[in-house]
Curated annotation (Swiss-Prot):
This is Lysine-rich arabinogalactan protein 18. The keyword NAD does not apply. Predominantly expressed in flowers, and moderately expressed in roots, stems and young leaves. O-glycosylated on the hydroxyproline residues. The gene is AGP18. It comes from the Eukaryota. It is found in: Cell membrane. GO terms for cellular component: plasma membrane; side of membrane. Proteoglycan that seems to be implicated in diverse developmental roles such as differentiation, cell-cell recognition, embryogenesis and programmed cell death. It is a lipid-anchor; GPI-anchor.
């Protein structure tokens, strides 16, 4: 352990001496950091105190920085062309005034003569007809006349048309003016009478209640 420590210390001294012998311009401003030597010893061996050597300080030589020369200003060209004069714009020519045509007054339209209104002819007074006594009597008779009861013949079928052909001599059926021998007409009349009686009885019952 002592030999290793001494070797490291001598190497550090050699490096410091080599760095100090360099030129001040190319020498670095800061010295390189030296690795620290191990100071711990094994537990069994007695602790050996090694002399601590202070590292030599490198002389900080002020590097002479070159002085920069001031920059010369760019030459200003004195012969600059004069500014071109701006041409003055002539005033605008006023537009000629167009005289508007004088409007003549409108010609009045001729008024058409309206035809005279027709004069209404006088209406002749027509004498009112005198009331007749016959009309009064008919009105009174109509008021007092009662409505006739419906006949049983009205409830039956309508009569045959008048334009039906008359009976021929060859026809076997009797004509309408001949007597009905079959009895169908009598049954029809009886049926009509029965229907009329039922209708009147029904009307009487309705009026009673």
């Amino acid at each position: 352990m002592d030999r290793n420590f001494l070797l490291t210390v001598t190497l550090i001294c050699i490096v410091v001496a080599g760095v100090g012998g360099q030129s001040p311009i190319s020498s670095p401003t800061k010295s390189p950091t030296t690795p620290s030597a191990p100071t711990t010893s094994p537990t069994k061996s007695p602790a050996v105190t090694s002399p601590t050597t202070a590292p030599a300080k490198t002389p900080t030589a002020s590097a002479s920085s070159p002085v920069e020369s001031p920059k010369s200003p760019a030459p200003v060209s004195e012969s600059s062309p004069p500014p071109t004069p701006v041409p003055e714009s002539s005033p605008p020519v006023p537009a000629p005034m167009v005289s508007s045509p004088v409007s003549s007054p409108p010609v009045p339209a001729p008024v058409a003569d309206s035809p005279p209104a027709p004069v209404a002819a006088p209406v002749a007074d027509v004498p009112a007809p005198a009331p007749s006594k016959h009309k009064k009597t008919t009105k009174k008779s109509k008021k007092h006349q009662a409505a006739p009861a419906p006949a049983p013949e009205l409830l039956g079928p309508p009569a045959p048309p008048t334009e039906s052909p008359g009976p021929n001599s060859d026809a076997f059926s009797p004509g309408p003016s001949a007597d009905d021998q079959s009895g169908a007409a009598s049954t029809r009349v009886l049926r009509n009478v029965a229907v009329g009686a039922v209708a009147t009885a029904w009307a009487v019952l309705v009026m009673a209640f």
